[in-house]
Design a protein with these regions (language model features):
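N-terminal strand-loop element at the rim of the active site
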Residues: 9-13, 19, 24-84, 98, ...
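Nucleotide-activated donor-binding/catalytic signature segment of Leloir-type glycosyltransferases, i.e.
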Residues: 66, 244-267
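Donor nucleotide-sugar binding/catalytic pocket of nucleotide-sugar-dependent glycosyltransferases
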Residues: 143-182
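A short helix/loop element that forms part of the nucleotide-sugar donor recognition site in Leloir-type
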Residues: 180-194
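Conserved donor-binding/catalytic core segment of Leloir-type glycosyltransferases
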Residues: 194-210, 216-219, 231-232
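Acidic donor-binding loop of glycosyltransferase active sites
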Residues: 271-287, 300
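Short hydrophobic beta-strand element within catalytic cores of glycosyltransferases
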Residues: 281, 295, 301-304, 314
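Conserved acidic donor-binding segment of nucleotide-sugar-dependent glycosyltransferases
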Residues: 316-328, 336-341
Length: 372
């Protein structure tokens, strides 16, 4: 099958880019795949982080950077390129309505000229910080799409609220296997200057909905109930970090809560996950998260909150714990994990469970949905 994938690839950084690159590589094993990348993903004035790029990741010379998200001329150029290729299938990933005008216009140009099947892999349909025009933009894009893949029940519900007759398949987010194998825990902790025997990790972009404040509050509970532990929270901050620093100072937990406001490059991800005992996602809202598949790849258990689809891929007491988005409950779940280490083999449970999240299965679903 001849396939075109449109979206975010390296040198752009982050989970979306990682997903696209992995999808491209996996599909290329058995199909003729062309990828089209952004020349401009976000204007700098609209990007809240320090940089859009990961300098440690090289862009694939076979992937053309054509699409400028705010330049309609580039949308036409991308559509023209795809029309010339005459693919059987075009694939997009959708995570925010900002890209709906460019993606929708590309599909409109294409549909006027050739018959082509189209598929959207849905991360988010209704964004975390929604605005009144989001549904209008999403509908504009989605009306040109034939098939959808949703990776959580909450996204499934959002899709059906906009398009009750949508043709879709639900399947969980596949594992990220692009970060390499885990490394020795003691060595990784030495590199990170972590001396405590217990390490709890919060990883990824820091945004209001991700509940870092809940984890700080949970740490204030843990300091009286857990011994010899460190909480490491690392990620680029998409908001003012001062309130978090103030909370840490107020609770006098500077010695046990290590807040590092920095992006972790691709080649350093395994260092942090290898060092950790457990990964915590104290989110206040969510659809699904790419952090859980990364944790599972490194056979690390998780504590997640029961928002969106986070709890759908956690086997309670076997691969992790599901908590309400409440600081005391999050703290209790962390305590329960450490209390059960001699009773539960979390690592082996996760290894078995990971068979449900293979990329082979995900690719098979893409093939199945478009040949119906």
């Amino acid at each position: 099958m001849k396939i075109v994938i449109v979206g975010t690839f390296p040198p752009y950084r982050g989970g979306i880019s990682n997903f696209y690159q992995t999808l491209y590589e996996k599909l290329s094993n058995s199909h003729d795949v062309t990828a089209i990348n952004f020349s401009l993903q976000y204007p700098n004035m609209l990007f809240p982080g320090n940089s859009q790029f990961d300098n440690n990741q090289k862009s694939d010379s076979n992937i053309e950077r054509i699409i400028n998200s705010i330049n309609p001329v580039s949308w036409y150029k991308a559509a023209k390129k795809i029309i010339e290729l005459k693919p059987d299938l075009i694939i997009f990933k959708y995570w925010m309505p900002f890209f709906a005008p460019s993606f929708g216009s590309i599909m409109r140009f294409i549909k006027k000229n050739i018959k082509i099947r189209s598929l959207v892999i849905c991360d988010n349909i209704i964004p975390h910080e929604s605005r009144f025009f989001d549904n209008i933009l999403t509908k504009y894009f989605f009306k040109y799409i034939d098939y959808f893949i949703v990776m959580s029940k909450s996204v499934e519900s959002d899709l059906l609220s906009l398009f009750p007759d949508a043709k879709y398949i639900y399947t969980p987010h596949p594992l990220y296997d692009i970060f390499g194998k885990g490394i020795n825990k003691d060595n990784s902790r030495r590199q990170l200057k972590i001396n405590e025997s217990k390490l709890i990790l919060f990883f990824g972009l820091i945004r209001p909905y991700k509940g870092l404040d809940l984890l700080i509050q949970a740490t204030n509970v843990l300091k009286n109930k857990l011994t010899d532990f460190k909480i490491l929270a690392i990620g680029d901050c998409y908001e003012n970090p001062e309130p978090y620093s103030n909370m840490i100072n107020e609770y006098k937990i500077n010695d046990i809560f290590d807040l590092r406001l920095e992006f972790v490059p691709h080649n350093k991800v395994r260092l942090y996950f290898s060092a950790a005992d457990i990964i915590v996602l104290p989110y206040k809202s969510a659809t699904q998260s790419g952090i859980v598949p990364v944790a599972y790849h490194f056979n690390k258990p998780v504590v997640v909150t029961n928002v969106g689809g986070l709890g759908e891929i956690v086997q309670e007491g076997k691969t992790g714990y599901v908590s309400n988005p409440d600081s005391v409950e999050i703290a209790n779940s962390i305590i329960e994990y450490f209390s059960n280490l001699d009773k539960v083999n979390f690592k082996e449970n996760i290894k078995k469970y990971n068979k449900n999240f293979s990329w082979d299965k995900f690719i098979e679903i893409i093939q199945r949905i478009v040949v119906k």
